[in-house]
Amino acid sequence: AAPLLGDAPAGYYPCPGNRVPLKADNHAAAVARMLEQRGVHYYWSWLPAKVGYDIYDEGEAVFSRAPITAAENLLLSKTNDYSNWKTRRTLGVCAGDVWYYTVHMGWWKDEEEPFAAQWETLSQAAGAKQTVFLLGDFNSEADVRGEGYDLILRSGWQDTYRLAQQRDDGYTVVQAIDGWRDAPDAAAKKRIDQIWCSRAAAVKSSR
């Protein structure tokens, strides 16, 4: 295991309930330090969710140009075991009057940890706030009907890709990736990484 990180780079906002210390090879800390060395200041937070590939502290980070005034550690899955790869958590941060949640959701057809149950937990927690953005890997294809993407739409959230005045083809996966290799369309292009807003925000571009 990597040694613990000494002093966290400037702008770090600890997430409540995070019991896993930052290590010297933490990627979010490396990005924060690189930006700091270039004279670009960001506020940031990091939340580990589980051990990935048996060696990594796999989690989520949010970087903000505005000061972070609050952070939230939300368990989305029924599983709450740091050594179990099906454990799902989301990191929420408040910057200004807006909350941002970065996510890595389970799959729609997972019998043990289905997307729908995780979405219900996330939607209730995030929906209680005024203006919210949900961003990250939803593991739900935007082009597939009747699954996770449509559930989010029916819940009243706005897809910022659709709201954008200018946008590219939208695909965030262009080849087979872990977690999708056994799917019939494993090599097909997909838009599983998305940004949703609790209201119809003005979006200039999505790319």
Placement of each model-derived feature along the sequence:
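Acidic helix-start/capping segments at beta-turn-to-alpha-helix junctions
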Residues: 1-6, 49-51
